[in-house]
Amino acid sequence: MIKDVIKKSEEKMNKTINSLNSELATMKAGRANPTMLDRIQVEYYGSMCPLNQVANVSSPEPRLLVITPWEKPMLKEIEKAILKSDLGINPNNDGTIIRLLVPELTEETRKNLVKNVKKVGEQAKVAIRSIRKDANDKVKNFKKEGTITEDEMKKGEDDIQKVTDKFVKEIDTIVAAKEKEIMSI
């Protein structure tokens, strides 16, 4: 019973880590990375689609992204979506492809990015702690129902805390690595 609760909690915590990694991948660190564009939605025949479903995105140079739409009329829509996004990069449309030159990050921009990284990391920690609380509540309910003893409840809570600590430490490591990546010139 308790093992199932811990296993489900670990699965949820892993999803939180995956979500953190995905979100941090979209944060530009002065290098062009196609994942920077993952959150951009483009209007495609009346409905919104992710950019990577209407175009090929490549990074031929460290600071350059090239977007090649599968249909030429999509150039304007892609350009419009990039301009509306929070990327802060101006697209260069040459009629067949769109080039995005990722600017060098200024010291101030780097510091703001690091603040955002810390904020996202803190949100992930809050999510992990929320999962821990839910797991502890389930274990306490088992005790109330009389299906486990007081000692089993305490051991279960300790095990849940160990799992939580492991994931919080992993978040700290991921955030520190991203900060280092952003601050390195």
Swiss-Prot record:
UniProt keyword list: Cytoplasm, Protein biosynthesis
Cytoplasm found in the keyword field: yes
One GO BP annotation of this record: translational termination
Subcellular location: Cytoplasm
Signal peptide stretch: none
Family membership: Belongs to the RRF family.
Role of this protein: Responsible for the release of ribosomes from messenger RNA at the termination of protein biosynthesis. May increase the efficiency of translation by recycling ribosomes from one round of translation to another.
Protein's name in the database: Ribosome-recycling factor
Organism expressing this protein natively: Clostridium perfringens (strain 13 / Type A)
Organism phylogeny: Bacteria, Bacillati, Bacillota, Clostridia, Eubacteriales
